[in-house]
UniProtKB/Swiss-Prot annotation:
Highest taxon of source: Bacteria
Pfam entry (one): IF-2B
GO MF, one annotated term: S-methyl-5-thioribose-1-phosphate isomerase activity
Name of the protein this chain belongs to: Methylthioribose-1-phosphate isomerase 1
Organism (species): Pseudothermotoga lettingae (strain ATCC BAA-301 / DSM 14385 / NBRC 107922 / TMO) (Thermotoga lettingae)
InterPro entries in alphabetical order: IF-2B-related (IPR000649), IF-M1Pi (IPR005251), IF_2B-like_C (IPR042529), Initiation_fac_2B_a/b/d (IPR011559), M1Pi_N (IPR027363), NagB/RpiA_transferase-like (IPR037171)
Residue positions binding substrate: 48-50, 91, 196, 247-248
The gene coding this protein: mtnA1
Catalytic activity of the protein: 5-(methylsulfanyl)-alpha-D-ribose 1-phosphate = 5-(methylsulfanyl)-D-ribulose 1-phosphate
Length: 346
């Protein structure tokens, strides 16, 4: 069984990922032949974006199961628990990682032969990947109704095809609007320190012919004040039960600025990103990454020796700042706690 998109390719025995650290000027691929290599690729941000991480982890789980099946002197379930733990430890904030791993774990039927288990797991991983594409396109269909023809949108980080299995969430909304015949202009925050906006989002948008204007993160407020922005759309790595949203660091600042200037602030994400076990944003674990990401830019040191660094990869935007959350099941509006509960049958 094979599967291929821009972000990833499953060969049946390995997972090939486009190396997002090298884009846009170099297109390299990293082939992962074991679950440990998949875990390293997630941790090192070869692949990033909550939905993409989830699907990648699912294929990593398959590779782990294939490896476990060859270990004659070890209990299959014990090995798979370790596979789960290794993959789950890679990126603590993105809930899609745990959602996908839990789904894969539930797929293991010990009443079946190992070969059947492996086949079931491979089918489930491909199903997760294929579902993500359909979900993203549905998010786009719902979300594009919020964008008027000729409007200008600001986005932060990268929530496009590269952050998902394909099509994208926030960029999927923009893409769907363009496909419906609307003319959309997009302002892209560069998104320090990893520059996902400059390197990935700008590249994706230009590839599909969208008018794209790159700005530094500290320009967003001034651009809003000048009346250049009609809406803001971002993705999400985890959404709490009350509607608080964890997303790439800098999202909170953009939300505050949007609120100050009366600009609608939209979040686009699949329902798998909603963690109903988390009451509010204060309970969401925030990953901290290497100091080198702040002190260096593309390997060039820009900060003095000995300077202290704080590098949280995500921040939390309170639900009061969010105009709507766009999901595959429709557009959620306040009160989020009640409407999210209804979405999950509460």
């Amino acid at each position: 069984m094979n599967f291929k998109t821009l972000t990833m390719q499953w060969t049946g025995n390995s997972l090939i990922l486009v190396d997002q650290r090298k884009l846009p000027h170099v297109v390299n691929y990293v082939e992962c032949k074991s679950y440990a290599e998949v875990a390293r690729a997630i941790k090192d941000m070869v692949v990033r974006g909550a939905p993409a991480i989830g699907a990648t982890a699912a294929f990593g789980y398959v590779l782990g199961a294939k490896e476990a099946a060859t270990l004659k002197n070890q209990n299959f379930i014990d090995v798979m628990k370790n596979v789960y733990d290794v993959l789950a430890s890679t990126r603590p904030t993105a809930v899609n990682l745990f959602w996908a791993l839990n789904r894969m774990e539930k797929c293991v039927d010990l009443s079946k032969a190992v070969d059947e288990i492996l086949e079931d797991l491979e089918k489930e991983a491909i199903k997760i990947a294929e579902e993500d594409i359909r979900i993203n396109k549905t998010i786009g269909t719902h979300g594009q109704t919020l964008l008027k023809d000729g409007c200008a949108v600001l986005t932060h980080c990268n929530a496009g095809a590269l952050a998902t299995v394909d099509y994208g969430t926030a960029l999927g909304v923009i893409r769907a609007a363009v496909e419906s015949g609307k003319k959309i202009k997009v302002y892209v925050d560069e998104t320090r320190p990893y520059l996902q906006g400059a390197r990935l989002t700008a590249w994706e948008l230009l590839e599909i012919g969208v008018e794209t204007i790159l700005i530094t993160d500290n320009m967003a407020g001034w651009v809003m004040k000048q009346g250049k922005i009609d809406a803001v759309i971002v993705g999400a790595d985890r959404i709490a039960a009350n509607g608080d949203v964890a997303n790439k660091i800098g999202t909170y600042s953009v939300a505050v600025l949007s609120n100050q200037h009366g600009i609608p602030f939209y979040v686009a994400a699949p329902t798998s990103t909603i963690d109903i076990k988390i009451k509010n944003g204060s309970e969401i674990p925030i990953e901290e990454r290497s100091h080198d990401e702040v002190t260096h830019v593309h390997g060039v040191k820009v900060a003095p020796d000995g300077v202290a660094v704080y590098n949280p990869a995500f921040d939390v935007t309170e639900h009061q700042l969010i105009t709507a959350i766009i999901t595959e099941k429709g557009i959620l509006r306040p009160p989020y706690k009640e409407n999210i509960a209804k979405l999950f049958g509460g």
